[in-house]
Amino acid sequence: MAIEENIKTSKKDKKSPPMLHVLRSFDINRPGLSINKLNGGVLGGTLSKGTFSIDEDIEIRPGHLNKKTNKYEPIYSKISSLGSSAGLMESVNPGGLIAVGTKLDPSLTKSDSLVGAVVGYPNEVADTHENLDVKIDLFDVAIGSPDMIKVDKIKNKEALRLNAGTAITAGLVTNVKNDIVTIALRRPITAEYNSRIAISRRLGDRWRLIGVGVIS
């Protein structure tokens, strides 16, 4: 096919440790269900690499906020079911949207409370960052702005919004050196080094995409 000559289908990496970006999280239990019939919390998202199988142990990062220490702590659980548009499965490969049933207390997953988290095998999940060093590449004009606003250089103490995988967080620039920007995050994110993020700046009453960056 001609399209394959110009835009090749990416190869699926099944050998690396799995990495699932959580796009939705649910409590699927109906009100009033008896305790012995409760299902664990469900995570929905895309498996970008690796494979998952039922009964495997998983780690979820950043996890939940410990209100005593004001720090996020990883959550550990086990896969109880796997599903896709094709139905229930024993194992899943990269690509497409999947649902991961877990043995988590459903109160941890209700109302999309784990959106933006990353799921993998214990001790093999990417690092969680409270501060980021980002090599930036700014656009000429802000994307989505009807006025074709020119993108100025990022300044120290400027507020930015970052998108990494399915995670969205705000941050404050604490240092700018050439094309490397250090950002203190309001909420930590879990992301691999050398992964790409989207950078937005508030222009008027909306956030506008102004560039991309690579976590260094």
Describe every region a protein language model picked out.
Residues 1-112, 118:
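Conserved catalytic-core segments of large NTP-driven translation/proteostasis enzymes
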Residues 106-216:
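C-terminal effector modules of nucleic-acid-centric enzymes and ribosome-associated factors
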